[in-house]
Amino acid sequence: MQKYKVYINNEVKIVEENWQDFCSKFIMVEAAGGLVFNKHGDILMIFRNGKWDLPKGKLELGESVEECAIREVEEECGVSGLEIESELSKTYHTYNLHESDILKNTYWFLMTTESEQKLTPQTEEGISDVKWCSEKEVEDNLNNSYPSIIDVFNSL
């Protein structure tokens, strides 16, 4: 039986029961995002709602997960010239929105860019900062992040 790792209120739950039954309790949201390296080996991170995070967002109708991941990184960070190198992982986390329980399934991709343009946070999405982070900065930032984001880094 396949096991699924789901973050509920930032606590891990391993779902071994029927996955479809578990999912039926939630509104499912498909999303995609990127762990992006620049040519200097720095990693792109965003600061949203008081936490360090990676750029990601919801799939639009007719869009592939790869297209979504690139679009979301571009929109949330103002970066261009993105190339997908590989798929990294999938994460699952729940949240409550307007009294509805949501289960977000996020597809994560390893990306690179040669771009050195000025980064621009998408403030209307609650993003107050976007920056290229050294390995040490990433380590520090992950102390104020989400467990699912730490999982993405661990999948490298």
Residue ranges of predicted features:
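Acidic, metal-coordinating catalytic segment for phosphate/diphosphate chemistry
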Residues: 1-33
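Unchanged
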Residues: 59-147
